[in-house]
A protein has these predicted regions:
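Bacterial Sec-dependent N-terminal signal peptides
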Residues: 1-24
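Structural signature of tandem-repeat unit edges
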Residues: 23-31, 48-56, 71-86, 91-102, ...
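Amphipathic alpha-helical interaction surfaces in cytosolic regulatory modules
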Residues: 63, 84-87, 240, 264
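Consensus positions within tandem repeat domains that build extended binding/scaffold surfaces
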Residues: 106, 136-141, 161-163, 263-265, ...
């Protein structure tokens, strides 16, 4: 998978690969609309990581949406998308023309009735081709766990209304192309990061070890986008986060022992979309999250929090 993920055990057991149950498959689709002929429904529903090559159309996207119940990571960076006209695509129950090299409208969002839509909530990461021209309306609407959209194209594809949520998804683009994306219509509010997404889960047994363990594993702190820390944290670890991790998108501290988020820890983390706070948290320091303008949704404060210092969430206008 393109998201580099390691599990660091700091109690001297070394580095273990993430061992969550995964089923990875790769298929080359020779004829558009025939993906489901290559596997059974039972096989499709067990796949978590899918790489597709060859030729796809809106029929294939409908099956990806409606079956493939556990699909988390979808890589179609080496697949082309063919034009399709008919009633068997992703649009609800009507004839529709789906243009070539476009992510179809409602590709991963199913209409339940006139006002209710259901996104594919299992999906966490998609990797799109450098040939994609459009991401059509509602393509990823309601995909509430889609944390990563990687686009291989150096210029932004056209983004149609409701196609992708800037409050949920960080967009990873080729080196040197983030300015072009920021100037694209409907792309202006997204968090753009150049290069490949990097995620790390660290279990700390010795306080202050976060920096040395990352470097020992060959990961520079500045490259980390998705950070999960378990175990013991001290001020040195928070200082590392504050001073050397500018590109954080998502942070999970729920299983660490910290009772205080120190002053200025996450100040001006401009890509930060969400955070899970330590369960035993008691205090949030001054300006701890100030200027995190993309931090959004509902922030759950642990029941033991008794102090939120001055300006802790100043400028976090998208938080509820």
């Amino acid at each position: 998978m393109n998201l580099k993920k390691i599990f660091l055990v700091i109690a001297g057991l070394g580095i273990l690969l993430n061992s969550s149950a995964q089923t990875s498959k790769r298929y080359t689709v020779a004829k558009p609309g025939t993906l489901v002929e290559m596997l059974t429904e039972e096989e499709a529903n067990e796949i978590t990581h899918l790489v597709l090559q060859g030729k796809l159309n809106a029929i294939d996207f409908r099956h990806l949406r409606d079956e493939f119940k556990k699909l988390q990571i979808l890589d179609i960076s080496n697949a082309s998308i063919s034009m399709y006209a008919g009633k068997n695509g992703t649009h609800p129950d009507r004839f529709y023309v789906y243009p070539a090299n476009c992510i179809p409208s409602y590709a991963f969002c199913k209409q339940i009735n006139d006002s209710v839509f259901a996104g594919k909530t299992s999906l966490t990461q998609v990797i799109l081709s450098d040939k994609v021209k459009n991401i059509e309306d509602g393509a990823f609407k309601g995909c509430t766990n889609l944390k990563i959209c990687q686009i291989r194209k150096k210029t932004p594809p056209n983004l149609l209304p409701g196609a992708l949520a800037d409050s949920v998804t960080a967009v990873f683009v080729p080196l040197g192309s983030s300015d072009a994306y920021r100037n694209g219509k409907r792309w202006e509010t997204f968090a753009f990061i150049e290069g490949e997404p990097v995620g790390v889960t660290v279990q700390i047994a010795a306080m202050g070890s976060l920096a040395s363990e990352l470097i020992h594993a060959g990961i520079q702190p500045k490259d980390v986008n998705f950070l999960t820390v378990e175990g013991k944290m001290d001020e040195a670890d928070f200082t590392l986060i504050r001073n050397y991790m500018p590109n954080l998108v998502s942070v999970d501290l729920s299983r660490c022992n910290a009772t205080v988020i120190p002053d200025y820890t996450f100040t001006q983390k401009k890509y930060l979309l969400n955070i899970k706070l330590p369960h035993g948290l008691k205090s949030i320091g001054q300006r701890a999250f100030s200027g995190c303008g993309r931090l959004c949704g509902t922030l759950v404060l642990p029941s033991g929090v008794t102090a939120i210092e001055y300006g802790a969430f100043m400028g976090c206008d998208n938080l509820r």
